[in-house]
């Protein structure tokens, strides 16, 4: 039965990803076509001094701006991204449809689910069995005294010594608190 759940979840996940990707590719077909023809996300008829330099930078013979900015070497941490390149990257990131635009991830997830024809809930946890209800009744602890609430004083001597009263060599002179003292302490 668990294999069935696994394959069902796998198929549902595949369908959800496929439908989400197909919906995104349909909306971006024009952008990807422009990217294939010009090398950038511009329309093919856009000409100007800027588009030629960008195509030359993105060509196979030279490094593009992104590759130049991501240089990992002995000066790691000392190289900074140029301000204009940083602005270009931020604009490109903001133009992406799946880019993070300051929205919470729950909103992005609901937008993806609303655009997809299927809704998938992955059930991976095993179903819980209901716990049996036990009615607990207290039973007396065998070998114990019945009166738990009373103060039981421990015997002053261990039973192996054979004594059952505290040793008092000066009988009559010890104060146990049972009678008042003839004198009072001044505090």
UniProtKB/Swiss-Prot annotation:
Compartment(s) where it occurs, according to its Swiss-Prot or TrEMBL record: Secreted
GO molecular function, one term: myostimulatory hormone activity
Chain spans, region Disordered: 34-58, 132-163
Domain of life where this protein originates: Eukaryota
Assigned keywords, A-Z: Amidation, Cleavage on pair of basic residues, Hormone, Neuropeptide, Secreted, Signal
Residues cleaved off as propeptide: 23-64, 80-127, 174-187
Residue stretches of biased makeup (Basic and acidic residues): 34-43, 143-153
Entry GO terms, CC: extracellular region
GO annotation terms (biological process): neuropeptide signaling pathway
InterPro entries: Pyrokinin_CS
Leucine amide modified-residue sites: 76, 142, 161, 171
Signal sequence coordinates: 1-22
Function: A hormone that controls sex pheromone production in females and pheromone responsiveness in male. Also mediates visceral muscle contractile activity (myotropic activity).
Entry similarity comment: Belongs to the pyrokinin family.
Protein name: PBAN-type neuropeptides
Gene label: PBAN
